[in-house]
């Protein structure tokens, strides 16, 4: 089906189930914080709820902004602020053309000035590694279009969007972010040592403690 402005699919209203979700591929590229030493994306993504923007052109970047821009989706930024550091936004600029990649590097200083310093390690430029097989596996069917992925703490793709956002897709993304943040909080609580967990509950009577919920993988 052909969608408006290159949109290749409409997003689910609910999260993909954990046991059915595919993993987001590990990519390697430079960041605004590390322009000379490439970094792995998985090292940054693992352990946090992540909203990942994936794009390879200015047009595609403008499309992902309709999902994750502060003015286009203020509810998402409220979640970033209230649930930090459990949730983060990551930008991945895929630039396989050598000349365009060189131009991006030349103007990285402008992006550093524009972005919050906290976002510098979360802005990647990836030159290679995103093969056709990987693109197909994550639903990136049109390299000219921007894509947004919501990942859980184990780098599993729990939701995805493409092209310009529609109102119901923004709602689905934000609901998914809140749900994964809650899952992450429960996961962290289940991993607390017993003494620390009891201290956080404010009780010293083990019989009155609420049960610890352990999240299954």
How should each PLM-predicted stretch be described?
Residues 39-72, 89:
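Short active-site neighborhood of thiol/selenol oxidoreductases, capturing the structured segment around
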Residues 88-92, 100-142:
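Short, internal strand/loop/helix patches
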Residues 2-41, 64-66:
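N-terminal "domain-start" segment that seeds a small globular fold
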Residues 61-77, 104-108, 173:
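Well-ordered, non-membrane alpha-helical segments in soluble/globular domains
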